[in-house]
Design a protein with these regions (language model features):
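Short, well-ordered secondary-structure micro-motifs
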Residues: 16-17, 45-49, 79-82, 105-106
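Charged helix-capping and loop-helix junction motifs
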Residues: 20, 50-54, 108-116
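Short, structured coil segments at secondary-structure junctions
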Residues: 30, 63-65, 123-125
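General small-molecule cofactor/ligand-binding pocket signal
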Residues: 35-37, 68-72, 129-131
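Short, surface-exposed acidic-centric catalytic microdomains
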Residues: 42-59
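Gly/Ser-rich helix-loop-strand patches that form or flank binding pockets
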Residues: 91-131
Length: 131
């Protein structure tokens, strides 16, 4: 079964809604399951639950079929996203252009010319869609 993972902010920002809309469309076209992921950063001191995330998404998009809501806790958004993608064997990762910029900055510490899509493709065998 194909799996699409989409990281979003909570509460949903305008960019998160656009990224999520694209992920919902991709999942429908590929007859795929969808994992909506929020990374709850320890340093922000919030305690977002899966129920909170689900309510926020359903308020914007209505009830979605074949969706799993995931809240990971961590210090680095990028690391938590990578963990989710690796653990689930996601086929497609849909990220917003702002998130892609953060990934580039994180990868710049490791690589000379960070190409987020190529980095993820090589290491995860996933398609990366930037919205």
């Amino acid at each position: 079964m194909t799996l699409v993972v989409v990281p979003v902010r909570y509460p949903l920002s305008r960019h998160s809604r656009a990224t999520l809309a694209e992920a919902v469309d991709i999942a429908a076209k590929r007859d795929a399951d969808l994992a909506v992921l929020h990374v709850d950063l320890y340093q922000e001191g919030r305690d977002v639950s899966r129920a909170d995330l689900k309510r926020a998404v359903e308020r914007e998009f209505g009830r979605l079929d074949r969706v799993r809501y995931v809240v990971r806790r961590g210090f680095l958004v990028e690391e938590a996203i990578l963990e989710e993608v690796v653990e689930t064997g996601a086929d497609v990762v849909v990220i917003g252009h702002k998130q892609a910029g953060r990934w580039r900055r994180a990868l710049r510490r490791i690589l000379d010319e960070p190409d987020v899509e190529a980095f993820l493709r090589e290491r995860l065998d996933s398609t990366v869609v930037t919205v």
